[in-house]
């Protein structure tokens, strides 16, 4: 059977993404795909992206109702039958299938969170994530952007972050003049609040140890008013190249990039006023944006992650000066990666806890983030 234009790109995305590195985020993959395929218009992009997310989110019941071996084509065949949701609701399905989670992941969540909270979490993880941006305080104010946008888009200020604006419909942000001018960045409200644990001041020396492309640095940089120095450290040179573009667009001038093998690192030991360690984690708090992660979950890998998190934190701690402050962060809801790790750092590294921060995915609310601010 011949495929429609949308179906062709749908299967190109699904099959191509399935072959990518298992830690490559779905939202980033979609953005890159559509940038490479300019012929896909905005309406088609929305429809294709929504279908991609639905097929990945609801993989378990789609496979359950299919009479064919599990493929993206067989799942799409069931998905195209409008009554599949009603069938799923009417059938007495095992809870992990009804909630569309691997049985091992569902069982782990029940053990970690309790059955009621685990099932609430699973249901919320199958919803669409809210669309939130963070205003760049180096270039404008939230009031100015709200005033400019409210005539064009359904927008509202976020309830908790003083820098956030929520969009109530999908928008191609990358095409907006304000984005190209660096007036805002796309960032979940919970991520903005995690960055607020970094109460940096002008003149401080700051290290973002697992910086990625610099999202958290961009969030706290305006506090420094272009005075002091921020170091963005990551082991991936290509992601630091992306950080360089974002810093330039945002007008952050007091930042340097450090790859893991940079010889300058040794000179920075015990000199930082602030260190942020936004660690590699399970990503369980962001499954609405990256539902593929639930199908890749393995308990053995989580155990390896916990050990890796402790090792990275210990490395980052060597850059903190006496009386400096270090912020540990994840985008996870698992206590093993959050409260348990913070307790380990206090017990074994002679640190004192100053502040804990946590968000849990809520209906139309923030993603799941955790942060702990500690000091000697």
Predicted regions and their residues:
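S-adenosylmethionine
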Residues: 1-376
């Amino acid at each position: 059977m011949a495929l429609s234009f949308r179906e062709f790109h749908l299967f190109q995305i699904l099959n191509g993404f399935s072959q990518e590195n298992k830690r490559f985020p779905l939202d980033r993959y979609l953005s890159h795909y559509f940038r490479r395929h300019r012929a896909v218009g905005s309406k088609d992009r929305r429809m294709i992206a929504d279908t991609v997310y639905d097929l990945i989110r609801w993989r378990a019941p789609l496979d359950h109702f299919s009479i064919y071996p599990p493929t993206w084509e067989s799942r799409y065949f069931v998905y195209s039958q409008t009554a599949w949701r009603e069938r799923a609701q009417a059938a007495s399905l095992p809870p992990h299938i009804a909630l569309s989670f691997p049985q091992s992941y569902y069982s782990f969540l029940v053990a970690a969170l309790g059955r009621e909270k685990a099932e609430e979490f699973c249901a919320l993880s199958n919803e669409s994530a809210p669309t939130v941006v963070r205003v760049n305080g180096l270039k404008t104010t939230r009031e100015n952007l709200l005033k400019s946008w409210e005539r064009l888009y359904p927008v509202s200020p976020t309830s908790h972050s003083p820098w956030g604006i929520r969009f109530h419909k999908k928008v191609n942000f990358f095409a907006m003049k304000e984005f190209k001018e660096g007036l805002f960045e796309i960032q979940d409200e919970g991520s903005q609040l995690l960055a607020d644990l970094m109460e940096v001041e002008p003149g401080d020396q700051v290290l973002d140890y697992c910086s990625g492309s610099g999202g958290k640095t961009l969030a706290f940089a305006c506090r420094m008013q272009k005075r002091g120095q921020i170091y963005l450290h990551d082991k991936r040179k290509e992601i630091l190249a992306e950080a360089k573009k974002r810093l330039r667009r945002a007008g952050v001038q007091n930042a340097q990039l450090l790859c893991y093998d940079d010889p300058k690192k040794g000179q920075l030991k015990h000199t930082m006023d602030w260190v942020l360690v936004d660690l590699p984690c399970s990503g369980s708090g962001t499954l609405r944006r990256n539902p593929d992660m639930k199908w890749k979950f393995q308990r053995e890998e989580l155990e390896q992650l916990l050990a890796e998190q402790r090792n990275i934190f210990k490395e980052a701690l060597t850059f903190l000066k006496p009386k400096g402050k270090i912020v540990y962060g994840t985008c996870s809801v698992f206590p093993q990666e959050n409260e348990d790790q913070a307790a380990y750092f206090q017990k074994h590294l002679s640190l004192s806890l100053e502040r804990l921060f946590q968000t849990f995915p809520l209906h139309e609310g923030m993603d799941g983030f955790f942060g702990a601010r500690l000091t000697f």
